Amino acid sequence: MKTYDFIGIGIGPFNLSIAALAEGLDGFSSLFLERKPHFSWHPGMMVPDCHMQTSFLKDLVSAVEPTNRHSFLNYLVQRKKFYRFLTTEQRTVSREEFADYLCWAADNLTNLAFSQQVQQVSFDEQNGLFEVVTQRDRFLARHVCVGIGKQINLPDCVTAQDDTCFHASEMMLRTPDLAGKRVTVVGGGQSG
């Protein structure tokens, strides 16, 4: 069984960033495990014409290594969007564009493994290694980073979710008829 220097559990933007930065390190082995079959970033919140609240320079790698091949600017070049982006003088990008960038980066990384549901993590004090067990494999690692994201939090008064009551993370996956109806948003941040 191969021993990795680093195993990441969950592949969201945080661990995707670590994967992109770790990929180019000589003599450093890393593996990132995700239960989903492919990368996706908030698919239920891809509201048309909704823009990021942060600069595109806060991508996966630019703050640490601006010349990394997984930068947002390189994504624009590879997708033949760079000159269009330059001429529009955008300071922020749409959530859909940023999601496409993240998928592009995930598609270009070789240290990601999808459809790998982590079932157990244990630490062997004797050899100083973590053992990470999935439904199909076992891995050993010197270091582990858990980046599984947040779980939705609904008030106790919400007993069922349907097209009349749901979490904002599912907004674009549902098709409620809101015409002429009153809508209440509970919470804030990205959804409020």
Residue ranges and their predicted role:
Residues L33-A99:
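Glycine-rich active-site loop/strand segments that organize a redox cofactor
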Residues I7-I9, V118, V132, R138-I152, ...:
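Short hydrophobic core segments
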Residues I7-I9, A19-M46:
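Glycine-rich FAD pyrophosphate-binding loop
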Residues R95-A113, V118, G147-I152:
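Helical element adjacent to the flavin cofactor pocket in flavoenzyme catalytic cores
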Residues F114-F130:
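A conserved short coil-to-beta-strand element within the FAD-binding core of flavoproteins
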Residues N15, F39, Q120, Q151-I152, ...:
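Glycine-rich nucleotide phosphate-binding loop and flanking beta-alpha elements
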Residues M1-F14, A179-G189:
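Beta1/beta-strand and adjacent pyrophosphate-binding region of the FAD-binding site
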Residues S94, I148-G192:
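Glycine-rich dinucleotide-binding loop and its adjacent helix/turn
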